[in-house]
């Protein structure tokens, strides 16, 4: 069943967390005119153009991001409202191992009207992450929009339990949203406060014929600091460094970082960009992801890579220390 709760955006800094902070700082620096804040809250309208992945890139006019070449999108940086996502599963209590349909409806927070216009980000308008309560199971899927404006996806969950849903989207003229939800299958013990026992795991992992190694900063990961997660990828059979990674959703990789309490979420992409049009499109063997992790604790890291037409996922568990604990 889907728990009857009002879903709100994750109140955490994410890779997109700087959207409001970064854009507002740019506005105060004179990058774009400052609108009437009260009027903006009542009648949101685009007042700037931002990069969905680098929110401190702000301009008055359309264009592309100088860092990632992603198209800038219209945004109202003073629209701090949290959009609503209504979820409905059919059957209402999905059975593990059997397909079911999940419908997600994005609603405007004031009028509660269905939001139909979402901006395409990394080739999709709606990114949905489905993660088991124990952080062992992970899916990154893309619901399709229906004539009524809702988004639908058919899923199969491998085992009973509580699953966290993260709806990641950008309303046209608004700011990026990450809206959390909860899905409970038939036969699950819906103890949302159950303690989580994660063990640190930074050893190399093999998936899709690739051996993926993760290197952390020499002094470890520190909360509140821009960090770099560095990956080296080899062929699992030969041990040779690979150079044939393929683009997946307009990037050479996708990484999701989630805190053990499931409250802090980062969706990141490699610093290594896809080549210019007309150039060979192959990546590897090294990729670097930037992440700002807001608090100390243990985090689960999933990274998706595509090679030879197959998307594979590797998972690591890392510790983040507090600045005072260094």
What positions do the PLM features span?
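Intrinsically disordered, low-complexity terminal tails/loops enriched in metal-binding residues
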Residues: 2-326
């Amino acid at each position: 069943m889907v728990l009857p709760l009002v879903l709100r955006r994750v109140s955490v800094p994410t890779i997109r967390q700087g959207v409001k902070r970064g854009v507002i700082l740019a506005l105060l620096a004179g990058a774009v005119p400052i609108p009437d804040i009260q009027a903006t809250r009542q009648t949101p309208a685009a007042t700037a153009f931002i990069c969905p992945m680098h929110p401190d890139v702000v301009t008055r006019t359309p264009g592309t991001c100088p860092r990632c070449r992603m198209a800038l999108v219209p945004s109202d940086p003073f629209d701090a409202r949290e959009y609503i996502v209504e979820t409905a599963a059919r059957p209402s209590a999905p059975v593990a191992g059997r397909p079911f349909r999940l419908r997600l409806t994005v609603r405007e927070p004031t009028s509660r009207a269905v939001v139909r216009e979402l901006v395409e980000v990394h080739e999709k308008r709606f990114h949905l992450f489905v993660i088991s309560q124990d952080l062992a199971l992970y899916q990154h899927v893309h619901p399709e929009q229906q004539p009524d404006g809702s988004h639908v996806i058919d899923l199969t969950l491998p085992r009973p339990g509580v699953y966290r849903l993260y709806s990641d989207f950008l309303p046209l003229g608004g700011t990026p949203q990450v809206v959390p939800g909860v899905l409970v299958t038939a036969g699950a013990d819906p103890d949302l406060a159950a303690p989580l026992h994660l063990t640190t795991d930074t050893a190399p992992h093999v998936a899709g014929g690739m051996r993926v190694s993760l290197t952390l900063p020499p002094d470890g990961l520190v909360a509140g600091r821009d960090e770099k997660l560095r990956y080296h990828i080899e062929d699992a059979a030969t041990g040779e460094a690979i150079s044939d990674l393929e683009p997946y959703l307009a990037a050479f990789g996708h990484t999701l970082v989630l805190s053990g309490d499931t409250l802090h979420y980062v969706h990141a992409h490699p610093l290594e960009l896809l080549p210019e049009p007309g150039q060979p499109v192959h990546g590897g063997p090294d990729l670097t992801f930037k992440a700002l992790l807001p608090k100390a604790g243990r985090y689960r890291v999933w990274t998706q890579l595509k090679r030879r037409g197959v998307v594979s996922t590797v998972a690591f568990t890392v510790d983040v220390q507090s600045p005072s604990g260094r």
